[in-house]
A protein has these predicted regions:
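Amphipathic coiled-coil/heptad-repeat helices and related helical stalk/stem segments
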Residues: 14, 55, 109-110, 140
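Short amphipathic alpha-helical patches
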Residues: 44-48, 79, 83-86, 113-117, ...
């Protein structure tokens, strides 16, 4: 899980080794939720980066999530390039046999992702992980950490 052995019942607290494990892994990392729930849909938090290219390749090659409804969300700064890349990603997923619903959300990615997960009862989130340096993370914060804190569903992270 994401809270670690010593987390107790402190809400929103992440385990002390979680970031280190994710940063060190060359494979996708699955972070389980506290309780099991049936997964009927998933959200791909798409930012157009290299980690999302790996996520798209994973989804095309693996049958793990095939048959589930895909919410493809682009959150943050939305411009023509972002929209084009998102639609190209949707086409790749459709070519791989996924039913895809595309959503563009200007503004805070962490909030947009958490809101969509809650509103659509999404069962698992796929996202990139720690794409910036630790120094930038200390100053600005980490989208990855906030997603892990605010989404109470399993998360599959790609580096």
């Amino acid at each position: 899980g994401k809270r670690g052995h010593g987390a107790g019942h402190a809400p929103g607290r992440l385990g002390s080794n979680l970031e280190r494990v994710i940063r060190a892994s060359i494979r996708p990392v699955f972070i389980a939720a506290r309780e099991f729930s049936q997964v009927e849909s998933f959200l791909l938090a798409y930012d157009g980066g290299q980690s999302m290219d790996r996520a798209l390749a994973f989804l095309a090659a693996q049958p793990l999530l095939r048959g589930l409804h895909c919410h493809l969300l682009r959150a943050g700064k939305i411009d023509g390039k972002a929209e084009r890349l998102t639609l190209e990603a949707a086409a790749k997923l459709q070519d791989a046999g996924y039913e895809v619903e595309v959503a563009l959300a200007a503004g805070d990615p962490e909030k947009a992702i958490a809101d969509r997960v809650a509103r659509h009862r999404i069962g698992v989130v796929l996202t990139g992980a720690y794409g910036h340096s630790r120094i930038r993370q200390l100053i600005v914060g980490s989208t990855t950490t906030e997603i892990l804190r605010t989404c109470h569903v399993p998360v599959l992270m790609f580096r």
